[in-house]
Design a protein with these regions (language model features):
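Glycine-rich phosphate/adenylate-binding loop
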Residues: 2, 109-113, 126, 136, ...
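Glycine-rich phosphate-binding loop and adjoining beta1-alpha1-beta2 segment
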Residues: 46, 51-89
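Hydrophobic/small residue at the entry helix of a nucleotide-binding pocket
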Residues: 33-34
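Conserved SAM/SAH-binding loop
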Residues: 98-106
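N-terminal charged helix/coil linker that caps or initiates catalytic domains
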Residues: 1-26
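Conserved S-adenosyl-L-methionine
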Residues: 42-48, 136
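Conserved N-terminal Rossmann-fold NAD(P)-binding element of oxidoreductases
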Residues: 27-29, 52
Length: 256
């Protein structure tokens, strides 16, 4: 009997779909990258999703974030994502966490309960804390490197952190992972050199912040706000979603 996952089952098979229906994945960061990862996971039949983010949808998110529309501005991202997931499949178990993940909140999570973890957060401190907790728990993790200030979505690659190049964030992560004796870390990164954002005082976040009331991390306190678009972070997020799904079901690609 056909259902909403029939077309996916034609590629993966019934046994793989059953694995996905019983899997629980945590996505840390529901923004330009993480939002599309959540979309891919929900549309692929994931049984349970944990969404972690403390931010609210801002008008400036509409250029790239799948959860951002005029009607969702000012709402918590995890709440909007939960509603969207349940519009796709009401049977998916969704757990939302309105928190900023970092060393201060890392012990609030039991990483042994997750079958896979996605890092789509934008601070090195948070990324490293997340990686360390996953390594301690033996939980698979995939990390997103820099997706801002880029224009070519075809330059993304999936590889180990120690095989990355070009990306400044990946360089920092390589150094910090070595210090922590992390032997392997699966990442999605771009070989495209980052552009320098055009300076334009009329749209400066520091001078014209429009973050919704109650936003915990306003753009006025950020060191730099990267330029972004609809077609680069989204691709990174979908690549990550695909990697999670393939890893969970043990997908073996055809040779040739």
């Amino acid at each position: 009997m056909q259902d909403q996952y029939s077309r996916t089952q034609l590629l993966l098979g019934a046994e793989a779909m059953e694995k996905l229906h019983h899997a629980r994945v945590a996505v840390f960061g529901i923004g330009g990258v993480g939002g599309y990862t959540v979309e891919a996971l929900a549309r692929s039949g994931m049984g349970a999703l944990d969404l972690i983010d403390d931010d609210k949808v801002c008008l400036t998110n509409l250029n790239r974030q799948i959860i951002a529309t005029r009607s969702t501005v000012g709402q918590y991202k995890v709440d909007v994502a939960e509603q969207r997931i349940h519009d796709i499949d009401p049977n998916i178990k969704v757990t939302t966490h309105r928190c900023f993940f970092g060393p201060e909140t890392q012990d609030d999570f039991d990483f042994t309960q997750y079958d896979y973890v996605v890092d789509a957060i934008d601070t090195v401190t948070g990324k490293l804390a997340l990686v360390m907790k996953c390594k301690e728990a033996g939980t698979p993790i995939i990390c997103s490197m820099g997706a801002g200030n880029k224009m070519d979505p075809t330059r993304f690659e999936v590889t180990d952190i120690y095989k990355t190049s070009v990306c400044p964030l990946a360089k920092v992560m390589r150094t910090e992972c070595r210090k922590r004796k992390i032997k392997h870390l699966k990442v999605v990164y771009s070989k495209e050199p980052a552009m320098t954002p055009i300076e334009d005082d009329s749209i400066s976040c520091k001078n014209h912040c429009i973050c919704p009331p109650g936003t915990q991390r306003k753009c006025t306190v950020r060191r730099a706000v990267p330029g972004s678009n609809a077609f680069v972070p989204s691709v990174a997020g979908l690549i990550i979603g695909g990697e999670v799904i393939k890893d969970l079901v043990g997908f073996v690609p055809l040779k040739g």
